[in-house]
Design a protein with these regions (language model features):
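Charge-dense, helix-prone N-terminal extensions
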Residues: 1-102
């Protein structure tokens, strides 16, 4: 199967979740030049390239976005973000996860 692009992936979801997905994606890429995006069937996974260790899964829902954030090798945290929710706390969690991966 061909690797789908992010845009192709997003066509399958309600357009109203696109701005939130775009913001989260932009934030993940802003963390470092080594961030790699892996488009899966129902989610977008962000990894650190050299280890290909994921730090966050981002999965669009109907009117929210579900995130699974890697806190440590054994611990993940699930966050459901409403479309109008403030991103600051979630971005901090994602940044911590990114910085924790070695």
């Amino acid at each position: 199967m061909m690797n789908r692009s992010y845009d192709d992936f997003m066509k399958e979801y309600d357009p109203k979740v696109q701005p939130l997905m775009d913001s989260l994606r932009k934030f993940c890429f802003s963390l470092g030049s080594n961030v790699v995006e892996d488009i899966r069937m129902h989610r977008v996974v962000f990894c650190k390239s050299f280890a290909f260790r994921w730090f966050v899964y981002v999965e669009p829902q109907n009117d929210s976005v579900l995130l699974k954030i890697q806190k440590s090798r054994r611990e993940t945290q699930t966050v459901e973000l409403a479309l109008d929710e403030d991103l600051d706390k979630t971005q901090e969690l994602i940044r911590e996860a990114y910085n924790t991966i070695h």
